[in-house]
Amino acid sequence: MNIQDLDEFLHIDTSGEKWHLKHPGELSPFYAHLPLHNYQNMQCYYFDFANTLKTDQIGVVKESRYTTIPPHYHKDMELNYIYEGTCTFIINGKEVTMNQGDLCILDTNVVHS
């Protein structure tokens, strides 16, 4: 994949992104089946990437745009790269705004949104 193909791929609205554009401010139906956990004195979701990482130790995911991801944690490390624009994260209760070209590596069990 060359840089032009990557750029085109990243700008295509996924079905999830189309849903979020039609339902601004609403929590994705994905969360309806996930229980909330009391973790570090917070109500948050636990994400299990067992299926994503079933055959490989590393998974690559294009995160949905146009949405807010609620507080969550997982047993896997996470690397976020801001390809374009800005994104505000809450990491361990601290607001962090990232810009194009920024990289963030989260350790295991770090609550973030």
Residues covered by each model-derived region:
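Short acidic-glycine-tyrosine-enriched beta hairpin
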Residues: G93-T108
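Short, flexible loop/turn elements at secondary-structure junctions
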Residues: Y81-Y83, D102, V110
